């Protein structure tokens, strides 16, 4: 085991954990940090490196499960119904939100992998996603009628699901597109963020699990320590990032993240081209 390469795995896990759920594009950051600096393909090989990125994403997913564990127990009916008969987020909201991107993702997975994963397309996604986020903040109603995730309607859930389709374009950012969509239909930034993270777990787990099954044969026993280090690094930093972001989003909204995305796109452009 090479300790320097183990540290690279930890750093990549950190980058994944910090950026997966923020509206800044984890793909864009992985391009800048991995492709231009750490180069995981050099010590893992191309296919094992791709599998490694799937594994560290699973670490981020586990962090979201931990943060929202009570909510998931409610959705699954383990904790019983919410007392008082008040409106409550349920599985139908989540399913409605998942369907559009889930269907398109299954139909066009191979096309997206073959034709849309390039530095140029990620740069386009970074900029277009930033413009959407700026527009969402500009045109959002000053007083959001949906303050909490439990007040979300089925129509709002479906619109957020439609907006999630934009995240199939690499670099667009799942949370950037869905939080923007939620804000545009009258949700508070916090309600939109909560729904985004809850909805992200099943769709990310499904996509990552499928990719892992397809590519696991490329992993050797020597790679396992790097995978474990990256997984736990992503888990820890995602845990911190999710909690921090949820406290921050209602205060600063989306524009600062949009500006950051544009700066990131410019930096990647000058480093890569």
UniProtKB/Swiss-Prot annotation:
Cystine bridges: none
A Pfam family this chain is assigned to: BacA
The entry's keywords: Antibiotic resistance, Cell membrane, Cell shape, Cell wall biogenesis/degradation, Hydrolase, Membrane, Peptidoglycan synthesis, Transmembrane, Transmembrane helix
One function term, GO molecular function aspect: undecaprenyl-diphosphatase activity
General remark: Bacitracin is thought to be involved in the inhibition of peptidoglycan synthesis by sequestering undecaprenyl diphosphate, thereby reducing the pool of lipid carrier available.
HAMAP family: Undec_diphosphatase
Protein name: Undecaprenyl-diphosphatase
Species lineage: Bacteria, Bacillati, Bacillota, Bacilli, Bacillales
Gene name as annotated: uppP
